């Protein structure tokens, strides 16, 4: 039996299931997500941006005022709201996977782990001055990154798809995901 990438069949077989992109901060969830959404004819949501709208505060301000646990509480509430919808590609926060209660929502959709190599991840975080990363504030970023990767690895590994990233562009990563989606939902050639 052969399988072939047929965009309309892939979209139909997905049946509106939400695609959740998980991975470390800087893994490319927010940049890959819009490209994947376009391929799937879905809408795109950046969960951190939605949290900022709901909380009327920036992620870094929530971390300062409420602490990480306070932020994670809001993140879980927003995830539950997102989970009520359909036909979305969602760029989640890097630590969303650390709460087991979130997996009840995530497993209703398809979870895709974006996993750039450590050097690429660190280079992205170092070069991106537009995004504040509260967990990296006032600490050695490499040590923090290594620690977070170690803490979250098994949680990320629960994803339905694991996408290793070397130097691919967000557009290329979206195409790889689309192809792998067609394989896991087994779109048969007519």
Curated annotation (Swiss-Prot):
The free-text cofactor remark is: Binds 1 Mg(2+) ion per subunit.
The UniProt record gives the binding positions of ATP as 26-31, 133
Record's InterPro entries?
Answer: P-loop_NTPase, Shikimate/glucono_kinase, Shikimate_kinase/TSH1, Shikimate_kinase_CS
What top-level branch of life does the organism fall under?
Answer: Bacteria
**Gene3D superfamilies given for it?**
P-loop containing nucleotide triphosphate hydrolases
Matching Pfam families:
SKI
Coiled-coil intervals: none
Single GO molecular-function term? shikimate kinase activity
* Cellular component terms per the entry's GO annotation: cytosol
Recorded hits in CDD domains, A to Z, give: SK (cd00464)
Which cofactors are named for this entry? Answer: Mg(2+)
| UniProt: Mg(2+) binding residues | 30
Q: Quote the pathway field.
A: Metabolic intermediate biosynthesis; chorismate biosynthesis; chorismate from D-erythrose 4-phosphate and phosphoenolpyruvate: step 5/7
Keywords from the UniProt entry? Amino-acid biosynthesis, Aromatic amino acid biosynthesis, ATP-binding, Cytoplasm, Kinase, Magnesium, Metal-binding, Nucleotide-binding, Transferase
Q: What is its EC number?
A: 2.7.1.71
User: Keyword Zinc: yes or no?
Assistant: no
Where would you find this protein in the cell? Cytoplasm
Catalyses:
shikimate + ATP = 3-phosphoshikimate + ADP + H(+)
Q: Where does substrate bind?
A: 48, 72, 94, 152
Q: How does it assemble?
A: Monomer.
Q: What does this protein do?
A: Catalyzes the specific phosphorylation of the 3-hydroxyl group of shikimic acid using ATP as a cosubstrate.
- Protein name, please? Shikimate kinase
What organism is this sequence from? Prochlorococcus marinus (strain SARG / CCMP1375 / SS120)
């Amino acid at each position: 039996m052969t399988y072939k990438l047929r965009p309309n069949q892939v979209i139909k077989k997905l049946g509106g299931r939400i695609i959740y992109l998980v991975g470390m901060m800087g893994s490319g969830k927010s940049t890959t997500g819009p490209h994947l959404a376009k391929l799937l004819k879905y809408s795109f949501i950046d969960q951190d941006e939605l949290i900022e709208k709901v909380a009327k505060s920036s992620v870094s301000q929530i971390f300062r005022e409420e602490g990480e646990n306070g932020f994670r509480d809001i993140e879980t509430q927003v995830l539950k709201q997102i989970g009520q919808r359909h036909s979305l590609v969602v760029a989640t926060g890097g630590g969303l996977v650390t709460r087991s209660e979130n997996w009840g929502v995530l497993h209703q959709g398809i979870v895709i782990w974006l996993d750039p190599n450590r050097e690429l991840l660190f280079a992205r975080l170092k070069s991106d001055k537009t995004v504040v990363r509260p967990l990296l504030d006032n600490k050695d970023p490499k040590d923090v990154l290594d620690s977070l990767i170690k803490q979250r690895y098994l949680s990320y590994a629960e994803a339905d798809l694991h996408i290793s990233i070397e130097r691919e562009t967000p557009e290329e990563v979206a195409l790889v995901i689309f192809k792998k989606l067609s394989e896991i939902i087994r779109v048969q050639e007519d």
